[in-house]
């Protein structure tokens, strides 16, 4: 199973492929960059860079409300002075954006 982050402002799509386990939960890695989608012990589902810095999270979904799978829906990211809104979509056959 793969996921896509679909950026709302310009329709840029980032695909994440399975990448083993982190903290006892499945993890995914962005196919073009060292960014991972993981379940953080305190923060819940998030994206992290290679240093482990959180740079994306579900919008308005607290960790205790999250399930064992990444939250599908609205996410926000922050990199330096820029923030973006994305939709996280679980891919099924034929549902990829590209």
Label each PLM-derived region with a short phrase:
Residues 1-98:
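Interface elements of modular peptide-recognition networks comprising either
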